[in-house]
UniProtKB/Swiss-Prot annotation:
Residues 390-432 are annotated as: Disordered. Binds 1 zinc ion per subunit. Heterodimer of a catalytic subunit and an accessory subunit. It comes from Anopheles gambiae (African malaria mosquito). Belongs to the queuine tRNA-ribosyltransferase family. QTRT2 subfamily. Its cofactor is Zn(2+). It holds the Pfam family TGT. One of its GO terms (cellular component) is cytoplasm. Zn(2+) binds at C329, C331, C334, H360. This is Queuine tRNA-ribosyltransferase accessory subunit 2.
Length: 432
């Protein structure tokens, strides 16, 4: 995998092209860009046919995580094919990572020589040998070595130091395994930068990885958050400071990745700081868990006075609104369906609801990144940032509370009866 840097602007980030894969030499990705977040190798809620309505080009870059692909190992091994062939995505690049950006890890202490992975069957500790055996079975186009990046702004210095020490140990062993492996000669490595919110530890992590710079096709900035919906509540300014400092130390000729469900405003800040590639977990969480459609504006020439960033499809006010989710949107959902229909699908718990929301949100995100690249090329990203900053956001999503069914009268009466003394119960038994 090769990254070609084409433009570095003064205040808008940089433009480049990611490509040069051994398996797919003609596949490329214009950056800044995103790769598609997947569950078990599939984009959540969308079939390959539905994806054609989002992006006419069937070729793309896929983000795979071992937490929801681990169960495929035995089947892929028996089939003697790559994971790209197994998930019927041979025309797509497969990038394998440790964590799923949409899933928060379960709290717990990590083992000394293993990393906890949170699968659909619960927590499982995976050793370096097990991880590299899995990578050899999958044979992805690119992968990240095993690392400990479970830190956030609340992590102690001791935890950040442990994260760095464990990661350095894992990376050294992975590099040695990779060099000796015949199965991984066509797979690229991506170096994980860890260290929490400690700038000195981040510098040490970058310095350690750059000792083997030739072995890495790019770098992944990790350890900023604990993934999942909580990313929306993180301190964006603190994370941005760490990202900007790390990007200054990384080589310009290598691609920089940073994953998480970041809101669009923070994405723009990270692009300006030098990040090249993101993921679509933000789109998935908005559609599947929050039932919200992305409607933020990225047209800086718009004269509309008020913009909102999201549309809550669960709101009863859309029950008789037969307009599209976003006026002027060219996606399949907005062209064929209305707000009232999507609201109805939510009320009836129809499977089509999240499908239509995912199609709209992904299309909107595709167009958003086109606008980002346009503004980076013209060094006008601050205009887009200011335009987005003036838009109104909905209150943070709160999951609905489970309604308790009313207790039957007979059961309630039993609970209200005074409890008998233990001695009285024994006396009754003796008399009986």
């Amino acid at each position: 995998m090769k990254f070609t840097l084409s433009t570095v602007t003064k205040c808008s980030g940089r433009l480049g092209v990611l490509g040069g894969l051994d398996r797919l030499p003609n596949l490329s990705l214009q950056t800044p860009a995103f790769i598609f977040h997947t569950k078990g190798g599939s984009i959540p809620h969308l079939s390959k046919e539905a994806m054609q309505h989002v992006s006419g080009d069937p070729s793309c870059f896929l983000h795979l995580s071992i937490s929801n692909t681990l169960h495929m190992q035995e089947a892929i091994k028996a089939s003697r094919i790559t994971i790209a062939e197994f998930i019927a995505q041979s025309n797509c690049a497969t990038l394998l990572f440790v964590r799923d950006p949409s899933e928060p890890p379960i709290p717990g202490l990590p083992e000394k020589d293993s990393l906890p992975i949170y699968t659909r069957n619960g927590r499982r500790n995976i050793t370096l040998e097990q991880y590299m055996t899995l990578v050899e079975t999958f044979r992805p186009d690119a992968y990240v070595p095993l690392y400990d990046g479970d830190t956030d702004a609340s992590s102690s210095k001791k935890r950040d130091q442990k994260s760095l020490d464990r990661t350095e140990k894992f990376v050294e062993q992975c590099l040695e395994w990779h060099r000796k492996s015949d199965a991984l000669q066509s797979s690229c490595l991506i170096g994980p930068v860890v260290g929490g919110y400690n700038e000195k530890l981040r510098e040490q992590s970058v310095a350690f990885l750059r000792q083997s710079d030739d072995a890495f096709a790019g770098y992944l900035i990790e350890g900023l958050h604990m993934h999942g919906p909580s990313v929306a509540r993180m301190d964006g300014s603190a994370a941005l400071g760490i990202v900007a400092n790390v990007c200054k130390q990384l080589p310009e000729a290598k691609v920089r990745l940073c994953f998480g469900s970041y809101d669009p405003a923070l994405v723009l800040e990270m692009v300006a700081a030098g990040v090249d590639v993101f993921d679509t977990s933000y789109v998935y969480l908005k559609a599947a868990q929050e039932h919200r459609a992305l409607v933020f504006s990225f047209d800086v020439t718009s004269t509309e006075q008020e913009h909102v960033t999201e549309l809550d499809t669960t709101d009863a006010r859309w029950a008789e609104d037969f307009g599209p989710l976003l006026p002027g949107c060219k996606c399949y959902t907005c062209q064929k369906h209305s707000r009232a229909y999507v609201h109805h699908l939510h009320n009836t718990r129809e499977m089509l609801g999240p499908i239509l929301l995912m199609m709209h949100n992904l299309h909107h995100y595709v167009e958003f990144f086109k606008a980002i690249r346009h503004h980076v090329a013209n060094d006008s990203l601050p205009e887009l940032r200011n335009h987005l900053a003036g838009q109104k956001s909905l209150p943070p999503y709160e999951p609905p509370k489970e309604e308790k069914l009313p207790m039957p009268a007979a059961q309630k009466a039993e609970l209200m009866e005074p409890m008998e003394d233990l001695g009285e119960k024994q006396n009754k038994k003796q008399r009986a």
